[in-house]
A protein has these predicted regions:
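Residues that define the transmembrane beta-barrel architecture of outer-membrane proteins
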Residues: 24-26, 45-51, 85-91, 107, ...
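Short N-terminal segments immediately surrounding and downstream of signal-peptide cleavage
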Residues: 26-42
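Cleavable N-terminal export/targeting peptides
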Residues: 1-26, 191-192
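Gram-negative (and chloroplast) outer-membrane scaffold detector with strong preference
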Residues: 54-125, 180-182, 187-191
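Predominantly the C-terminal beta-signal and adjacent terminal strand-loop region
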Residues: 74-79, 86-88, 146-192
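Transmembrane beta-barrel strands of outer-membrane/channel proteins
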Residues: 30-34, 68-72, 111-117, 142-144, ...
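Repeated loop/turn-to-beta-strand initiation elements of outer-membrane beta-barrel proteins
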Residues: 26-28, 61-66, 150-153, 192
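Outer-membrane beta-barrel translocator domains and adjoining extracellular loop/strand segments
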Residues: 40-47, 76-84, 121-130, 134-136, ...
Length: 192
């Protein structure tokens, strides 16, 4: 029964995206890829992976749109003796600036940036009883849509900075956790 409901919901969402007027297009995105920690976060976390889901609104004849997305990240601890991973769940609200969205072009460059909440927690055998920590962060990046009518493939890279999201291993003070997810995915509702 649950699978039937999920399938019906997916069909309804695709129908809405396909039937939306040319004036504005609702877009649904799914993707995933690798996540690279940078700065002091790179001292405590190894390269990870992520999955992403998003919903966006992009007017057809206006370059500025809006996207809300959620990501799940998993990083290994840099110290090999620790049997644990960093788990991160984030939700962000973003402004999207799309360059030259004419229907004749199949490739569309865009800039994306916004703010959000990031929950970080250590998980695994050596992290039992670890507390989670939720902090504010910002992100900015760029991507490329490969449009195929109401379906598009995309590749995107963003720099994220979580204020107070990690600990400086030298001073043990709170530090900004920075990372760059590289996402490859599909978009329903128009890439062109």
């Amino acid at each position: 029964m649950r699978g039937l409901r999920s399938g019906a919901l997916g069909a309804v969402l695709l129908a809405i995206a396909a039937a939306a007027p040319a004036v504005a297009q609702v877009r649904f995105s799914l993707g995933g890829g690798g996540t690279l920690p940078v700065g002091t976060f790179d001292d405590v976390a190894g390269t990870g992976w992520h999955g992403m889901a998003a919903i966006g609104f992009q007017p057809a004849d206006f370059p500025v749109g809006f996207q809300v997305d959620g990501m799940y990240h998993r990083f290994g601890f840099e110290a090999e003796a620790i049997d644990a991973d960093w788990q991160m769940i984030q939700g962000t609200a973003n402004i999207v600036f799309a360059f030259n969205r004419s229907e004749e072009r199949k490739f569309h460059l865009y800039l994306i940036g916004g703010v959000g909440g990031y929950n970080v927690k250590a998980v695994g055998d050596d992290a039992e009883g670890a507390d989670s920590d939720t902090n504010f962060g910002v992100n900015a990046g760029a991507g490329l849509d490969f449009g195929l009518g109401n379906l598009a493939a995309f590749v995107e890279g963003r720099y994220h900075a979580i204020f107070g999201g990690t600990v400086d291993p030298e001073t043990l003070d709170d530090a900004t956790a920075s990372f760059v997810p590289i996402t490859i995915g599909i978009r329903f509702g128009g890439g062109s």
